[in-house]
Amino acid sequence: MTELANIPELLASRIRDVADYPEPGVMFKDITPLLADPVAFTALTDTLAAGRRRHPRTKVVGLEARGFILGAPVAVRAGLGFIPVRKAGKLPGATLSQAYDLEYGSAEIEVHAEDLAAGDRVLIVDDVLATGGTAEAAIQLIRRAGAEVCGLAVLMELGFLGGRARLEPILDGAPLEALLQV
């Protein structure tokens, strides 16, 4: 594995800035070059999975959509099950749902009702922490299922959007780990 001190540098070097996407004035952080690089992608998933030794977990939850791309290999590396949290209407069968507010409107996420239960210790994985709205809804959803949130891990945090300040009070001491700060 890549030396721990060099991992943030490696990851940052594989993220491409795309100006004015998806709209003028936005600098989009494209992680597809990182995903295409097997050394960088392995370093990322190994680093996120390593937290299992510090904070025991039973399952990994990935938030739609890029949280699936990161969360599934983290679960495999950690020897845990992977649970997708999806936009409403995308999962068949019985689901639990959680509504949340967006800047302009609202949204809803779901999980299969049988996928989480009392005694589960869950790590939430996503690509980016921005305002924290989706992550907050996921925390509420996981707790409503009877499971415990034992951490939130993201590739990068957009600190200027205040997601950490929103989430830390409701994480009840569970760690919020961002490998890169933007």
Swiss-Prot record:
Sequence similarity: Belongs to the purine/pyrimidine phosphoribosyltransferase family.
One term of GO molecular function: adenine binding
Principal location: cytoplasm
EC number in record: 2.4.2.7
Subunit-structure text: Homodimer.
Species, as recorded: Streptomyces galbus
Protein name: Adenine phosphoribosyltransferase
InterPro entries in the record: Ade_phspho_trans, PRibTrfase_dom, PRTase-like, UPRTase/APRTase
Cellular component, GO annotation: cytoplasm
Compartmental location: Cytoplasm
GO biological process: adenine salvage; AMP salvage; purine ribonucleoside salvage
